[in-house]
Amino acid sequence: MTTDAPKLAISITYCTQCNWMLRSAWMAQELLSTFSLELGSVTLIPGTGGIFEISFGDELVWERKRDGGFPDSRVLKQMVRD
């Protein structure tokens, strides 16, 4: 019997008022295409007030206001690898 390591759950919270759903969905697609076997889930969570946050489990790894905009897909993928 083999034991599988727990798979990473990623959540992307985006602002619906800012029309960032497509950006969020594209990032989710990029992650799922690259890490299809390593990820447990990628969840899109609608929000308001200019929010754009990416969390790995309970850890906030990207926040638009704090980190200055949106992550490049290359940067986001490197964060998953690390």
Q: Which residue stretches match the model-derived regions?
A:
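Domain-level signature for proteins that mediate thiol-based redox and metal-cofactor handling
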Residues: 1-82
